């Protein structure tokens, strides 16, 4: 019996080692592609006239969709911030999804909302819309009040009432850089076959605000928040850019993405029966366009910045990651027919297998790998020197990738101007490998068991908001002065 156990453990250890090597090779390839893409972007950035896109009446107008559920502390500040976007023509459609707090009252008080008879432009099924409101103080504001149906249902209601050909889906607790819309719209106008573009999401915890706008980017003092900053940088700069440049991007963050409205209406909008409605929509767009032999460019752009609050307590973080993993499982299961089908190109033959074997099964393999590796060490199947060497190699490789994305951030964007911020992030890149990453692997593995028992609902998190509201009026007048932004002026970021 002992001999059989040793054979099983030895076989699993060999499998785990091979799995680890393949995964690290994929990460390396994505990081190399991402680095080259960042270098290319930095080189070409001065040639992109985002100011012209922001000011031109020929630019494609945008409907910003903001689904909101119990967002009273931050919704007014978020909306006023969105209204300062440097873009010629846009509307902000806030969808109050049956909030039980003062979200609707806060919007009414701030903008003097008046109920109107606005006819929807599409008929994606949603929960009952109780009323549509506009603001005589700010004509770009539209508020939809509806029965609760979840985030996807709220977004579908927003799509139905949006009047422009592009819609930008963002979370109610997020803040956009002033020129974010013009940067994303550039992609649609430069490449007409573009169906969707995702922008990078950054963590705002610890930063300073002035008049409801982000004044100074700082890293937070909270350890969990700093660990998530490293995660986000690695996911977006070290992974998503690589997938995008390879034509295999499957995920656009629900916090910030720009889509062609007509194509999304064709596929039926967001799926309200899944918790991962954002990723599921992207995969459905790929599938829809390929099945009809239509061009489908879905890409990621690293510069338009969306700022969001992240969880600062363990309970909220665990619930968030469980929800994300369940959404990923649902997405892959629903579109499993795409797997290894040449009809779907690299999406079906490369991206889908990766997500199944490394994103879905990865946490389970990782957790069992830890447990069986320790058991092998106890039984003497694996020697202590080998175990220590393997741990050292794994840690070193993880640190190299984390340091690389920090370097990429510094090379291209320099959003963290202080040396103390960079030192804090560097230390967190080390700390996350001891306990934090393993904890998240357990949470993601557990998602298989929570999937069947969970109903679709909003993921709630305590918000701190974005500081004081803009003084006076409803929103500041957008400033299109290129000197306010070094990139708009065609200049590189200033030296520290």
Residue ranges and their predicted role:
Residues 60-63, 91, 265, 280:
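Cell-envelope/extracellular polymer assembly enzymes that use nucleotide-activated donors
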Residues 54, 354-452:
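Membrane-embedded multi-pass helical conduit in multi-pass membrane proteins
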Residues 263-266, 274-300:
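A short, conserved alpha-helix in the catalytic core of glycosyltransferases
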Residues 96-116:
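A conserved acidic beta->alpha catalytic loop
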Residues 116-142, 147-156, 160, 164, ...:
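Long helical/loop segments within the catalytic core of UDP-sugar-dependent glycosyltransferases
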Residues 1-58, 240, 372-375, 401-408, ...:
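N-terminal membrane-anchoring/stem segments of glycan-assembly enzymes
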Residues 167:
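Short aromatic/hydrophobic "clamp" motif used to bind/position activated sugar donors
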Residues 30-89, 105-108:
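N-terminal signal-anchor transmembrane helix
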């Amino acid at each position: 019996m002992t001999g059989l156990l040793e054979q099983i453990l030895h076989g699993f250890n060999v499998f785990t080692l091979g799995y680890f090597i393949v995964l690290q090779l994929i990460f390396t390839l994505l990081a190399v592609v991402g680095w080259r893409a960042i270098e290319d972007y930095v080189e070409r950035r001065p040639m992109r006239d985002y100011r012209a896109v922001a000011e031109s009446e020929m630019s494609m107008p945008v409907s910003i969709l903001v689904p909101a559920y119990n967002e009273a502390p931050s919704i007014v500040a978020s909306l006023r911030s969105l209204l300062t976007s440097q873009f010629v023509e846009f509307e902000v459609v806030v969808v109050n999804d049956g909030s039980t707090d003062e979200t609707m009252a806060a919007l009414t008080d701030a903008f003097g909302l008046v109920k109107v008879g606005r006819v929807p432009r599409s008929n994606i099924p949603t929960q009952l819309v109780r009323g549509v409101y506009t603001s005589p103080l700010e004509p770009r504001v539209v508020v939809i009040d509806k029965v609760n149906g979840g985030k996807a249902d709220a977004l579908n209601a927003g799509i139905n009432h949006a009047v422009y050909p592009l819609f930008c889906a963002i979370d109610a607790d997020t803040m956009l850089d002033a020129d974010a819309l013009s940067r994303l719209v550039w992609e649609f106008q430069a490449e007409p076959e573009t169906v969707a573009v995702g922008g990078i999401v950054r963590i705002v915890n610890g930063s300073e605000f002035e008049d409801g706008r982000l004044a100074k980017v700082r890293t937070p003092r909270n350890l969990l928040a700093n660990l998530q900053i490293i995660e986000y940088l690695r996911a977006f700069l070290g992974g998503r850019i690589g997938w995008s440049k390879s034509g295999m991007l499957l995920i656009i963050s629900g916090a910030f993405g720009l889509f062609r409205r007509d194509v999304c209406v064709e596929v039926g909008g967001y799926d309200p029966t899944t918790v991962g409605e954002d990723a599921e929509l992207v995969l459905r767009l790929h599938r829809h366009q390929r099945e009809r032999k239509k061009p489908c460019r879905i890409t990621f752009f690293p510069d338009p910045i969306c700022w969001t609050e992240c969880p600062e307590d363990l309970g909220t973080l665990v619930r968030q990651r469980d929800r994300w993993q369940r959404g990923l499982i649902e997405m892959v299961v629903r579109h499993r027919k795409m797997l290894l089908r040449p009809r779907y190109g690299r999406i079906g033959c490369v991206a889908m297998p990766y997500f199944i074997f490394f994103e879905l099964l990865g946490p389970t393999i990782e957790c069992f790998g830890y447990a069986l590796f320790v058991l092998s060490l106890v039984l003497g199947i694996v020697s202590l020197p080998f175990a220590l060497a393997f741990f050292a190699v794994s840690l070193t490789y993880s640190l190299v990738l984390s340091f690389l994305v920090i370097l990429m951030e510094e090379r291209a964007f320099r959003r963290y101007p202080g040396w103390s911020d960079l030192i804090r992030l560097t230390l967190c890149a080390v700390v996350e490998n001891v306990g934090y990453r393993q904890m998240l692997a357990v949470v993601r593995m557990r998602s298989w068991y929570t999937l069947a028992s969970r109903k679709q609902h909003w993921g709630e998190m305590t918000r701190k908001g974005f500081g004081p509201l803009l003084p006076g009026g409803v929103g500041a007048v957008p400033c299109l002065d290129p000197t306010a932004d070094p990139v708009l002026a065609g200049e590189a970021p200033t030296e520290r």
